[in-house]
Amino acid sequence: LLYEQILRLFPKNRDSIKSLITSLVKQGRIIHDKENDLLCDTAESASNPDYGMIAAFWVLLDFKKAVVYHTNGDFPIKLNFFSKDEWYEILYIPLEQEYLINHVMESQSADQVKRLVVLENEGQARKVTIDNVVAFCLVDTTSGVVSYYTKK
């Protein structure tokens, strides 16, 4: 994740979180790639960041005040979170992977879940046939600004 994402997760404790991050880096428990401003668990993840997870986490941060619990998901779901009585999945669809993700999601139960789908560009939405999509998301991964829209 990006350093700024972790700080935004704990906005009232920014200084404490910065100290904790510094301590974890000194202990070798996490890696801070200062050039890309990434916090990673391994050198391998620092050299090959999961930009889909970074984008999905920006979406999660938009819902932060309402989130009761969150966890990672299984491919192609990046994150799951619960808000009140609602269950959400955040998916990330890279360019040219729309049909693959559609196929994988056909076997996934969609009875009670609401899906937020992060795309690389707006044109991908017309190729997505996943059930229970409540919004498509475009994420500026640098600023964290998320734009939400629905398919017409």
Tell what function each PLM region has.
Residues 1-10:
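Short acidic, hydrophobic short linear motifs in intrinsically disordered regions
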Residues 1-2, 29-105:
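Nucleic-acid-binding surface
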Residues 2, 16, 124:
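Short phosphate-engaging motifs
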Residues 11-26:
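Short amphipathic alpha-helical interaction segments
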Residues 20, 100-107, 128-129:
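A short acidic, amphipathic alpha-helical/loop segment
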Residues 85-92, 110-120, 134-136:
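Hydrophobic beta-strand segments of well-ordered beta-sheets in folded domains
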Residues 123-152:
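Domain-level recognition of nuclease-like catalytic cores that cleave nucleotide substrates
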